[in-house]
Regions:
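N-terminal, active-site-proximal structural segment of metallo-dependent hydrolase catalytic domains
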Residues: 1-49, 60-65, 158
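Active-site-proximal beta-strand elements of phosphoester/diester hydrolases
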Residues: 1-10, 105-120, 151, 254
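Structured beta-strand-rich core segments of catalytic domains in phosphoester-bond hydrolases
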Residues: 35-38, 42-118
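Metal-dependent phosphoesterases centered on the DNase I-like endonuclease/exonuclease/phosphatase
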Residues: 50, 130-223
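Conserved beta strand-loop-helix elements of the APE1-like EEP
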Residues: 61-78, 214-235
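Active-site beta-strand termini and strand-to-loop segments that position acidic
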Residues: 70-71, 97-103, 229-230, 252, ...
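Surface-exposed cleft-lining segments at the edges of enzyme active sites
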Residues: 82-87, 113-131, 168-172
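Surface polyanion/phosphate-binding segment centered on an Asp-His-Pro turn
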Residues: 240-261
Length: 261
């Protein structure tokens, strides 16, 4: 079975892309970020016609997350969580559910991590505070759910291999020491970066700036991740960044990242 994450940068604009990609990939669970739509206009019916259910938390213009699940291979989720508990936040950045699958019950957490804007600013402080609370939440969830996957746009490139020009980015947002330390903190809970379970070629990224021909020049970063618990780690058969949707007309600046169990 396949689990994937994709920052679609507006579901209203990118819905045809999502539907086309689901049709060809037959992904079982797809986590989406940056919906940029409110819940009342979420495309429940369109997705249902394709055989997908969804849980979601949206807001106008910004943020928003969803988990789509293929109804013929995955049961409807239980124990749904919207946003981080005990963290007052109007921004819709997290949704979680427990899904019964062919690989057993999987606690699936979809997150749109704060960008942080610029090192040292208020948005950066918010990002670090959010990451601290996320770590506490994931630690608690791991105690209840042996099979756990944390999928999303992390807005963190874990190390220099994940940046097209490390020297140019050094110390900046997405790669600052504090952000990378927060990523390592998640790994220290017992999670593994599914992408690094395999030998990967150099220069593989999940996001490219729209400006300056970023995609065409492969000036990108790997900031979209799927971390898996030890119980899931042994079941991961492959991990692949699918660049195809980034080549379509009016694409998201991100592309799907997929693992297969």
């Amino acid at each position: 079975m396949k689990l994937a994450t994709w920052n679609v940068n507006s579901l209203k604009v990118r819905l045809p892309h999502v539907m086309q990609w689901l049709e060809t990939s037959q992904t079982d669970i797809l986590c989406l970020q940056e919906l940029k739509i409110t819940d009342d206009v979420f495309p429940v019916n369109e997705l249902a016609m394709m055989g997908y259910g969804a849980i979601f938390a949206g807001q106008k213009t910004y943020n928003g997350v969803a988990i789509l699940y293929r109804q013929d291979t995955v049961e409807a989720p239980t124990d749904i969580q919207i946003n981080l508990p005990d963290f007052t936040d109007e921004q819709k950045r997290l949704v979680a559910g427990t899904f019964e699958t062919k690989a057993g019950a999987i606690r699936t957490i979809c997150g749109y991590f704060p960008n942080g804007a610029e090192v040292g600013c208020d948005k950066y402080a918010y990002k670090l505070a959010w990451l601290v609370k996320l770590q506490s939440f994931v630690k608690e969830e791991l105690g209840k759910h042996p099979q756990l996957a944390l999928l999303g746009d992390y807005n963190i490139a874990p190390d220099d291999r994940d940046v097209w020009n490390p020297k140019a980015w050094e110390g900046n947002i997405l790669v600052s020491p504090a952000e990378r330390a927060a990523f390592q903190g998640l790994l220290q809970l017992g999670l593994s970066d599914s992408f690094r379970l395999f030998d990967q070629p150099e220069g593989l990224y999940s996001w490219w700036d729209y400006r300056m021909l970023g995609f065409q020049k492969n000036h990108g970063m790997r900031i979209d991740h799927i971390l898996v618990s030890d119980a899931l780690k042994t079941k991961v058969k492959s991990a692949q960044i699918d660049k195809t949707p980034r080549k379509w007309e009016k694409p998201s600046d991100h592309t799907p990242y997929v693992i297969e169990l």
